[in-house]
C-alpha cells in the first residue's frame, strides 16, 4: 500500500513550493491523495478488508484536517491544491 520511492519523489517534485520542500501542506495532501486512491482500488477488489477500510478513513480524515488548515491560512493555495488534485469541496 505504501508509495514507491520514485512515485513519492515524483509527487513531491510536482507540489513542492521550493527546492527542499517535502513537508508543506500541499505536498502532504498530494501524497495522502495518492495513498487514498491506491487504497480505494485495493478495496474495490478486496471488499471485506475492513482493516484497510479503517486505514482509509483515517487517511481521509488526516487529509481533511490538512485541507482545513490550508484553507484557514491561505485560501489561494487551498484552491490551487483542490483544483490540481481534482478534489471536490
From Swiss-Prot:
GO terms for cellular component: cytosolic small ribosomal subunit. The keyword Hydrolase does not apply. It comes from the Bacteria. Transmembrane segments: none annotated. One of its GO terms (molecular function) is structural constituent of ribosome. One of its GO terms (biological process) is translation. Keywords: Ribonucleoprotein, Ribosomal protein, RNA-binding, rRNA-binding. Signal peptide: none annotated. The keyword Ribosomal protein applies. Part of the 30S ribosomal subunit. Forms a bridge to the 50S subunit in the 70S ribosome, contacting the 23S rRNA. One of the primary rRNA binding proteins, it binds directly to 16S rRNA where it helps nucleate assembly of the platform of the 30S subunit by binding and bridging several RNA helices of the 16S rRNA. Forms an intersubunit bridge (bridge B4) with the 23S rRNA of the 50S subunit in the ribosome. This is Small ribosomal subunit protein uS15. The lineage of its organism: Bacteria, Bacillati, Chloroflexota, Chloroflexia, Chloroflexales.
